[in-house]
Structures are given as C-alpha cells and as structure tokens.
C-alpha cells in the first residue's frame, strides 16, 4: 500500500501491518490536512480532530 505524505506529491510505501492510509484534520479547519500517512487502525474522531481512513493506494 502506498500512502500520500503531508504534501500529496510525495508518498511512502507502508510497512507490514499498516494497511490503511489516513488524513487528519483539525475540526476547526477541515480544508487543510494536518497529517497524512500509514496507520494500522483508524483512530476515533474527537472534538478537535477528524480522521479519514482508506485502503487503496494514495487514497489519502
């Protein structure tokens, strides 16, 4: 699986076991992702942070 880094022109291949890509947004500003990368389990959203997870190459 390949996931985009913070700047979507760059991406990385995920290590074994991390088979989801994710984007993290601040709830107050949903237009600009704060973090992107590979993850094993999609984190729960909180009052401050929203996560979007997916499982295809460069989907984040």
Curated annotation (Swiss-Prot):
Main location: secreted
Organism superkingdom: Eukaryota
GO annotations of cellular component type: extracellular region; membrane; other organism cell membrane
This protein's record includes keyword Heme: no
Tissue: Expressed by the venom gland.
Any one of the GO BP annotations: killing of cells of another organism
SUPFAM superfamilies cross-referenced by the UniProt entry: Snake toxin-like
GO molecular function annotation: toxin activity
The entry's keywords: Cardiotoxin, Cytolysis, Disulfide bond, Membrane, Secreted, Target cell membrane, Target membrane, Toxin
Compartments in which it is found: Secreted; Target cell membrane
KW Protein transport (keyword) present: no
Task of the protein: Monomer: shows cytolytic activity.
Family the entry assigns: Belongs to the three-finger toxin family. Short-chain subfamily. Type IA cytotoxin sub-subfamily.
Record's subunit section: Monomer, or heterodimer with alpha-cobratoxin (AC P01391); disulfide-linked.
Protein name from the UniProt record: Cytotoxin 2
